[in-house]
Amino acid sequence: MDAAAAAGGEMSRQKATASAPPPPELDMVARAVQRLVARNDAVEALSGGGEAAAGLGAGMAAFEAARGAPAPRIGVAQYLERVHRYAGLEPECYVVAYAYVDMAAHRRPAAAVASRNVHRLLLACLLVASKVLDDFHHNNAFFARVGGVSNAEMNRLELELLAVLDFEVMLSHRVYELYREHLEKEARRDGGGGDMLAGASAAAAAKAGRMAAVSPSKLLERAAVNGAAQHDDWRSLGTAAAAEAANGVRRHRSSSSSRYSFDC
C-alpha cells in the first residue's frame, strides 16, 4: 500500500508540474540547443550538405529524419514545452538531457546536432533522464505519443542513445553542476534569467546521488519491459560499469579527447 501511495503521490506531483509554467532549466536548455543547431545548420549549408551525409551511419543515424524529409516545423523551445506540458518532468531532467546531447556530440563528432535530428535526440535524452532521475516515470509509449513518433521508433531511439553513451548515463554532482553553471552563463549572456537556478544545488546533489544508484542493467530491464529489443553486446554491462561512471569525470575509452565540453 505504501508503494501505491507513493506512486499516486508521484503522479499527482507530475500533474502539478505539468500544469505549472515551464521551469527556467527548460528555457536555458532550449537557448543553448538552438544556438548549437543554428551553428551546425549554417556549417552544413556552407559545406553543401557534406557534413549531413557524413553524419548518417556514424552512430546516430536513428536520430536523422528520413532521407529527403524536411526538418520538423516545431521549434526546439516549443517542443520542450510540449514535453513539459504532458510529461511534467523534474527540472533537473532538462539539465541532464542537455548533458547527454553534449556527450553524444563528443562521442559522434561526425554527426552534427542539427535541425534534422535535434527533436528525436532531445526526446530520447529526456526519456533516459527521466528514467534515471524519477522514481516513477512515463513509459516509452507515452513519450512516443508526446514526441510524435511511433512506439517502435521511440524504443530504437532510446537504445541508440544508450549505445552512443555506452550506458554511461550517471553524472557526478560535479559534472551536473558544470553543465548547470554553463547553462546559467549562456542564459545571462542572452539576457535570460540565469540566476533563477540559484539555490538548486541541494536538489542537484540529491539527484546526483540517485543517478549513481541506477545501473545500466536496470535500464536494460526497463527497456525490455517497454518492448525494446536488447542488443547482445550490452547484456554483459552491469554494476561495474555503473560504479565506474559514478566515480566522476573520466576520458572515453576509445578517444584521447574529453567526454565533455569542460576541462574537469
Swiss-Prot record:
<comment type="similarity">
    <text>Belongs to the cyclin family. Cyclin U/P subfamily.</text>
</comment>
<dbReference type="InterPro" id="IPR036915">
    <property type="entry name" value="Cyclin-like_sf"/>
</dbReference>
<keyword id="KW-0195">Cyclin</keyword>
<keyword id="KW-0132">Cell division</keyword>
<dbReference type="GO" id="GO:0051301">
    <property type="term" value="P:cell division"/>
</dbReference>
<dbReference type="Pfam" id="PF08613">
    <property type="entry name" value="Cyclin"/>
</dbReference>
<protein>
    <recommendedName>
        <fullName>Cyclin-P1-1</fullName>
    </recommendedName>
</protein>
<keyword id="KW-0131">Cell cycle</keyword>
<dbReference type="GO" id="GO:0019901">
    <property type="term" value="F:protein kinase binding"/>
</dbReference>
<dbReference type="InterPro" id="IPR013922">
    <property type="entry name" value="Cyclin_PHO80-like"/>
</dbReference>
<feature type="region of interest" description="Disordered">
    <location>
        <begin position="1"/>
        <end position="25"/>
    </location>
</feature>
